């Protein structure tokens, strides 16, 4: 049963990230604009996201940072901490961007820091220095939009 629950959380996580940025308008989401940050020569809005307890879901204690390109409004980078399964922090970089019937699809490289206690805001600096460890790649293949019947 523990394996099934962990697998279910993993699938939910993939679906959550695939639906970004649309889920950021959920009523349980608390957003804080932290200004503009330059990453690899491009400017990004840095947005901190947390969740209200009520309607915030099972993982309401998780926190996120999103870096949104000021020109395209696409999320190119994100970082998050999580409590489940022993907790930790992760950083993701978007790759393989493509449009499917106007909807942005993208894959991610999933990184972990050497120090699990690092702050979310420090992860982008560690990424730019090449100091994060690649843990996995999230590849969203065969993306298709089905008619809403």
Identify what each model region corresponds to:
Residues 1-60, 82-85:
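Flexible, processing/modification-adjacent segments and terminal tails
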Residues 148-149:
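Short, solvent-exposed mixed-charge patches
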Residues 45-143:
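Gly/Pro-enriched, hydrophobic low-complexity segments
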């Amino acid at each position: 049963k523990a394996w099934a629950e962990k697998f279910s959380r993993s699938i939910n996580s993939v679906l959550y990230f695939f639906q970004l940025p649309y889920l950021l308008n959920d009523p349980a989401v608390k957003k804080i604009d932290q200004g503009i940050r330059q990453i690899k020569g491009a400017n990004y809005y840095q947005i901190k996201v947390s969740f209200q307890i009520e309607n915030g879901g099972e993982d309401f204690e998780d926190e996120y940072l999103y870096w949104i390109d000021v020109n395209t409004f696409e999320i190119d980078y994100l970082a998050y901490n999580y409590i489940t399964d022993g907790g930790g922090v992760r950083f993701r970089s978007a790759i393989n961007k493509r449009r499917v019937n106007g909807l942005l699809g993208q894959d991610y490289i999933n990184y972990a820091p050497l120090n699990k206690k690092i702050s979310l805001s420090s992860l982008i600096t560690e990424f730019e220095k090449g100091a994060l460890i690649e843990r996995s790649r999230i590849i969203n293949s065969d993306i298709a939009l089905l008619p809403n019947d």
